Amino acid sequence: LLTCSPGKEVWAQYGHTAIRYYDKESGEDLAINYGIFSLDQTYFIPRFVLGMTDYRMGVQPMDIFLAQYSYEGRGVIEQVLNLSAEDKEVIYEALQENMKPKNVVYRYNYFFDNCTTRARDMLINHLHGKVVYPPAEEDATFRSMIHKWNNKYEWAQFGEDLLLGVNADRKTTKSEQQFLPENLRSDFDKASYNGKPLVKETNVLLAAENKVAEPAFPLSPLSIALIFAAISLVMMLLSYRRQQVYWAWDLALMLTSGLMGIIFFIMIFSQHPCVSLN
């Protein structure tokens, strides 16, 4: 199991998960990645918002995979799994089947079917035994878990909080908590398989660069809200004292609230399970 540290882009703020397949005899060394997408896809942004985005499985040489993450300054941790030859053969055959063109595309879901859960299921679902994980974090919700990772990105957190509904605040199961790469890595590290540790050894393939997250916009959502409230108060007092209607300001208010209403209305039809009930 490969666990990659977070990146700067919004879609990389929570890290990434991949599978490494290494055959010592043949020298074949591959990274299997379930997080391939293209912003050039037709209507990518609207489809992503509505939960209709298709991701795909990708396979590339391990050295190219590492070179990409090295260029981005992101770390990669490898966990070598303690599997039997039979387990490895079954997983290899399952990967070969998954690599067929008819099987590489899947409907992405941020919480329940993403690059991390796909990698986990490919490994765990093809083992000849039971994997035992540590107990689930009792009070963890989807919202609280992502807040741990985007607390330095206030606008990303604000946008997600704006869209996520009540289903994001329910308690989660152990399986659901593994949608985050670091959660899965930690669980694998503490898990047992047929009475033995699931992870045989852990290697740091790339060390993450310690970069301080810089806000994309200098003002926080709270700052903008306070400024907006102050301006609204001033405009209200001016309108009252001068007995004058400021049409431009009223128009801006109506357009802003109207656009927000349209967005919330559209999200009713989103296929994201934690968004529609907002």
Where are these regions (language model features)?
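Residues in flexible loops and secondary-structure boundaries
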Residues: 9, 40-42, 56, 89-91, ...
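Short, exposed beta-strand "edge-strand" segments with a Pro/Gly-rich flavor and a Y/T-containing core
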Residues: 76-83, 216-217, 273
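Glycine-rich catalytic cores of cysteine/serine-nucleophile enzymes that process amide/ester linkages
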Residues: 1-73
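Extracellular structured ligand-interaction cores
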Residues: 16, 29, 78-80, 116
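Catalytic-site beta-strand/loop segments enriched in glycine and acidic/polar residues
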Residues: 1-2, 95-99
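Second-shell loop/turn segments in exported
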Residues: 7-8, 74-82, 101-110
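A structural motif
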Residues: 83-96
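Activation targets extended, charge/polar-rich intrinsically disordered C-terminal tails
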Residues: 97-278
